[in-house]
Amino acid sequence: IMQAIGQDDGSTLGTNIPRLAINRSPEDDDGNQLPVGHFYTYDSSTGQNVYSKPVTLRPFISAMQYMHYDAVKSEYVNRSIIFKSWREEAIDILGGTKCGKIPFKERSSLTPEQLEEQRTIRCYKLVYGLLSFDKGVTAKGETTSVKNLPVLYRVTGTAFSPVTSALDLLNKRKKLMFNCTLSLNTKRQKKG
């Protein structure tokens, strides 16, 4: 959060804010069964990942960021600044904008290779907030709970719109997001 608000240039190594994500793996490296489709995050108080569904999130900051992932290198090779509005120019670390992402309606003249590269450039919705849940578990099946844990919930793809819509609804109701608590749940959807 300190980097996002300009208090830290990112040059010092420190503790990162844990990410809230959806678990898609049926087991961990130790063979423990994990709850697929549940939210998970790293809980530093227990030193392990914790899983739960549903969870609540009290959002404080909402922003977006373009990132370009290189599967061969297994790393992000470019990222834009964190921006809060589509009216802002998303300058990236390589000197371009939006990590080279081209609007869908302008892609008709691209080669198959260029189209494939476009699929590796994504816009992420970033929501910084406080995570809470009562009925969680660890990978070993121990029950746990989390209360007001600072997290980053980073979504893209099909999860981008529902998160954005929920925050837009708060804006339309003239409610400050940090005065609200969102209930997050997942639903399995099959492709095709």
Please tell me what each predicted stretch does.
Residues 1-144, 191:
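OB-fold ssDNA-binding interfaces and closely related basic DNA-contact patches used
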Residues 123-192:
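Extended serine/threonine-enriched, polar tracts that run as long, contiguous segments within proteins
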